[in-house]
């Protein structure tokens, strides 16, 4: 689960500034703990535990602190009037990765972002093997030997796959320093309009500056301000509330992270909340850094419309009370909103996209960071190849070639299957969701690894689906058949209509 919009203390369905933020996934400890029932109360002083309200917890949330990188950036000089080879709009991980790789080939690049030095504010979680494949292990500041999934009070799954938290400052510093070494120029502004000509585009910024570029890359997340869509946009939404906190203690194994905890025993004394959770369930995602420092996040996997953030906060407080977790202080909190699924943008179109604006979030899980970082070389190489060819290309020809490499038919078919999975998850209540993931994590690791990391393509996904069906209980099979028939028909129709 990986892309989010973050606001200080409210979740708002708004367009982000340039760049994207990402939401981490959710895991848990290897042993089942019986926490019993305890009574808690709000206390004066640093330790707070609340019943029935998130207000006391939110009182611990500090004012938003914006941390910036401490080095000078080479700024774009508009007086020269040069046409850069590539203008990257958005300074998130994907945008900087493409800027870095295109500039390494000797092409001129301008990165445009309202806050180019700002360290990304969100907690990114990734499977360690994903970052290892990209030589980014030095950008993880914490790792766990594995993860765990709690299906219910009696069933837990050990996931023998290392997991890590991204060191946001290190990753951005590493990318920015390479960009600077390669000659990338930076412009601190927001692009409000793009005007296209035959061989170049003009980016109009909110500071009155116009930047000319041969290729424009939209890496602004979910703003969809530059990349165009021509179909109704009706995604599912993953919504979460998380805190990085100092606690008196917590019950989790510090060597494991909690990927999903679907237990609801913390709601047994709250009939209304228990019924709401049964209809649209939430789970706990936790990254324990030590015995008293932990990241905790309550997450709605996918819903349409998305759950209200105050509903999720209320569920989180009830869970923490039940687990006996007393929060002493909160270093940071985050409100996560991840649009999942929905249509792809118009393919092709003049502006090239990557990340959320290009429909790259995993429709079934919300993951995106590793996927977009892995796609950055694909986009960069396509740009380098066509800008470096001897034959001159029009702007439309260039962008068509890049979009084709970013979304080949194999990737489009893969995404269609993932959307099918999302459509089923949207219809599952808590008992059905538990049965689904009980079967999912019983699969051979190569199947659930590949599904979560977008490494399976349509032929393998069909085998994955059949294997999941065979591992499911009879009740779950019936649910998949009844709730999945219409999504399956829609998927098949879309696959048949999508041609090379």
Curated annotation (Swiss-Prot):
Pfam family, one: Lycopene_cycl
Gene Ontology CC entries for this record: chloroplast; mitochondrion
Binding site for NAD(+): 86-114
Family assignment from sequence similarity: Belongs to the lycopene cyclase family.
Keyword Isomerase on entry: yes
Summary of the function given for this chain in its UniProt record: Catalyzes the double cyclization reaction which converts lycopene to beta-carotene and neurosporene to beta-zeacarotene.
GO biological process, one term: xanthophyll biosynthetic process
UniProt enzyme class: isomerase
Top-level taxon of the source organism: Eukaryota
UniProt-recorded name of the protein: Lycopene beta cyclase, chloroplastic
Transit peptide: 1-81
Lineage of the species this protein comes from: Eukaryota, Viridiplantae, Streptophyta, Embryophyta, Tracheophyta
InterPro entries in the record: FAD/NAD-bd_sf, Lycopene_cyclase_b/e
